[in-house]
Amino acid sequence: MTDTRNLTQLGSKTQAPASPEAATLETAPFSRGDGPAAIVRFTCPEFTSLCPVTGQPDFAHIVIDYAPDKLLVESKSLKLFLTSFRNHGAFHEDCTVMIGRRIVEATKPLWLRIGGYWYPRGGIPIDVFWQTGTPPKDAWVPETGVPPYRGRG
């Protein structure tokens, strides 16, 4: 049975953190066993942050793939972490990379990649990609399934 004693957010009424810096990513133990590494995917199709200059909302479809080693990121804490960006002002690139780095810091995975598919602002969609290296050998890493942005063209 998984040891959940260190989880404080799961199963509790929890306020959304005021900022990404105030958010806590919690982890649970993972036994990966023998064979190819497992790949875990989180998809956040309605991610929101604020433009650091205008304060206007920015929206993205975020896809996170990682190969856990000994720790899993607990999904409620991840949800609260992602929600904490709602009132956070940062550029698309900064938000995307910050998310990836925080998960790496918390879980120390074998591998992680994140894709931030940002909806157009000023007529330009911005896609941001970051990863820690090459995927583990023989791991099944499916395509993200996010099509390139197409307007009415």
Swiss-Prot record:
Residues 1-17 have a biased composition (Polar residues). The keyword Manganese does not apply. It is found in: Cytoplasm. Keywords: Cytoplasm, NADP, Oxidoreductase, Queuosine biosynthesis. GO terms for molecular function: preQ1 synthase activity. Pathway: tRNA modification; tRNA-queuosine biosynthesis. SUPFAM superfamilies: Tetrahydrobiopterin biosynthesis enzymes-like. GO terms for cellular component: cytoplasm. It is an enzyme of class 1 (oxidoreductase). The active site is at 51 (thioimide intermediate), 58 (proton donor). It holds the Pfam family QueF. InterPro entries: GTP-CH-I_C/QueF, NADPH_dep_7-cyano-7-deazaG_red, QueF, QueF_type1. One of its GO terms (biological process) is queuosine biosynthetic process. Substrate binds at residues 73-75, 92-93. It catalyses: 7-aminomethyl-7-carbaguanine + 2 NADP(+) = 7-cyano-7-deazaguanine + 2 NADPH + 3 H(+). Its EC number is 1.7.1.13. PANTHER family: NADPH-DEPENDENT 7-CYANO-7-DEAZAGUANINE REDUCTASE. Catalyzes the NADPH-dependent reduction of 7-cyano-7-deazaguanine (preQ0) to 7-aminomethyl-7-deazaguanine (preQ1). Belongs to the GTP cyclohydrolase I family. QueF type 1 subfamily. This is NADPH-dependent 7-cyano-7-deazaguanine reductase. It comes from Chelativorans sp. (strain BNC1). The lineage of its organism: Bacteria, Pseudomonadati, Pseudomonadota, Alphaproteobacteria, Hyphomicrobiales.
